[in-house]
């Protein structure tokens, strides 16, 4: 899709770069697959901030996405490709042969009128969902289950993909974009192809207000705070006086924070460290 740079008619327009998607449906979403979505402002039930930098933003409805893809051997037609404010990927509205409609994450190059299927005997085509044991080696996949029947958890964002490298007994070996190589059970399902909206990372919001529309509040540097607010706060000038840390004193550069030993044996090779 073309990337359009806005004319600098105002300071807020000067740096705007957006990806144009003429194929997206212009009307309202399918009402039966919508749910209300209430904003928390990053607060918990006590009214205390549990996640910083959240607040405001445009009202949104949640689109109910079919991440399990368990409607097997029934062909579905892509009725339309839609924008979804809850994720970076686009979504596709499917109409099954029995009349049921469901939303799925749209695959790259998926178009209106395409036929989509789920199940072990589905053809290897973008958007089709199969168990990992039925997918040819070397295939690029997305929307991957980590537990059988739980629904897709991995590679769901715009442009995301994983490559199926091989199979070892009851496990499939996958290479992630991060460089990590890991095992997943061969009965877990995955969808063929890459996730749609691959150029999402090339856009530029252009102004602070565009982040506020998305419900993202400003991030204040620790060195600009007082000592009571952050370990980097206070002092004359801009010295931290210590290694970079979070507001709660945890080291924020290079410290390992993974504590899930239960799945350590599923990771064959760790992702590469940043240089």
Curated annotation (Swiss-Prot):
<feature type="region of interest" description="Disordered">
    <location>
        <begin position="222"/>
        <end position="275"/>
    </location>
</feature>
<dbReference type="GO" id="GO:0003735">
    <property type="term" value="F:structural constituent of ribosome"/>
</dbReference>
<keyword id="KW-0689">Ribosomal protein</keyword>
<dbReference type="InterPro" id="IPR005880">
    <property type="entry name" value="Ribosomal_uL2_bac/org-type"/>
</dbReference>
<dbReference type="InterPro" id="IPR012340">
    <property type="entry name" value="NA-bd_OB-fold"/>
</dbReference>
<keyword id="KW-0687">Ribonucleoprotein</keyword>
<dbReference type="GO" id="GO:0016740">
    <property type="term" value="F:transferase activity"/>
</dbReference>
<protein>
    <recommendedName>
        <fullName>Large ribosomal subunit protein uL2</fullName>
    </recommendedName>
</protein>
<keyword id="KW-0699">rRNA-binding</keyword>
<feature type="compositionally biased region" description="Basic and acidic residues">
    <location>
        <begin position="229"/>
        <end position="239"/>
    </location>
</feature>
<dbReference type="GO" id="GO:0002181">
    <property type="term" value="P:cytoplasmic translation"/>
</dbReference>
<dbReference type="Pfam" id="PF03947">
    <property type="entry name" value="Ribosomal_L2_C"/>
</dbReference>
<dbReference type="GO" id="GO:0019843">
    <property type="term" value="F:rRNA binding"/>
</dbReference>
<dbReference type="InterPro" id="IPR022671">
    <property type="entry name" value="Ribosomal_uL2_CS"/>
</dbReference>
<dbReference type="InterPro" id="IPR002171">
    <property type="entry name" value="Ribosomal_uL2"/>
</dbReference>
<dbReference type="GO" id="GO:0015934">
    <property type="term" value="C:large ribosomal subunit"/>
</dbReference>
<comment type="function">
    <text>One of the primary rRNA binding proteins. Required for association of the 30S and 50S subunits to form the 70S ribosome, for tRNA binding and peptide bond formation. It has been suggested to have peptidyltransferase activity; this is somewhat controversial. Makes several contacts with the 16S rRNA in the 70S ribosome.</text>
</comment>
<dbReference type="Pfam" id="PF00181">
    <property type="entry name" value="Ribosomal_L2"/>
</dbReference>
<dbReference type="InterPro" id="IPR014722">
    <property type="entry name" value="Rib_uL2_dom2"/>
</dbReference>
<comment type="subunit">
    <text>Part of the 50S ribosomal subunit. Forms a bridge to the 30S subunit in the 70S ribosome.</text>
</comment>
<dbReference type="InterPro" id="IPR008991">
    <property type="entry name" value="Translation_prot_SH3-like_sf"/>
</dbReference>
<comment type="similarity">
    <text>Belongs to the universal ribosomal protein uL2 family.</text>
</comment>
<dbReference type="InterPro" id="IPR022669">
    <property type="entry name" value="Ribosomal_uL2_C"/>
</dbReference>
<dbReference type="InterPro" id="IPR014726">
    <property type="entry name" value="Ribosomal_uL2_dom3"/>
</dbReference>
<keyword id="KW-0694">RNA-binding</keyword>
<dbReference type="InterPro" id="IPR022666">
    <property type="entry name" value="Ribosomal_uL2_RNA-bd_dom"/>
</dbReference>
């Amino acid at each position: 899709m073309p990337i359009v740079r806005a004319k600098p008619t105002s300071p807020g327009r000067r740096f705007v770069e957006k990806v144009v998607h003429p194929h997206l449906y212009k009307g309202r979403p399918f009402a039966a697959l919508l749910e209300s979505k209430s904003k928390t402002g990053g607060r918990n039930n006590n009214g205390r901030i549990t996640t910083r930098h959240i607040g405001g933003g445009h009202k949104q409805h949640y689109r109910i996405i079919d991440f399990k893809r368990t409607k097997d051997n029934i062909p579905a037609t892509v009725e339309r490709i839609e924008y979804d404010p809850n994720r970076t990927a686009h979504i596709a509205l499917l109409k099954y042969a029995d009349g049921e409609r469901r939303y799925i994450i749209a695959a790259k190059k998926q178009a209106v009128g395409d036929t989509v299927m789920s199940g072990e005997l589905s053809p290897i085509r973008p958007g089709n969902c199969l168990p990992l044991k039925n997918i040819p080696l070397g295939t690029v996949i997305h929307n991957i289950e980590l537990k059988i029947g739980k629904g897709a958890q991995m590679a769901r964002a715009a442009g995301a993909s994983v490559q199926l490298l091989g199979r070892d007994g009851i496990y499939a070996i996958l290479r992630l974009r991060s460089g990590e190589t890991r095992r997943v059970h061969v009965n877990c399902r995955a969808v063929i192809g890459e996730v749609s909206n691959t150029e999402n990372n090339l856009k530029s919001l252009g102004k602070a207000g565009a982040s506020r529309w998305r419900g993202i509040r400003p991030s204040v540097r620790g060195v600009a705070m007082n000592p009571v607010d952050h370990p980097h706060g206070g002092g004359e000038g801009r010295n931290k006086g210590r290694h970079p840390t979070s507001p709660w004193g945890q080291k924020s550069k290079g410290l390992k924070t993974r504590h899930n030993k239960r799945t350590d044996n599923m990771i064959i090779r760790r992702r590469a460290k940043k240089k």
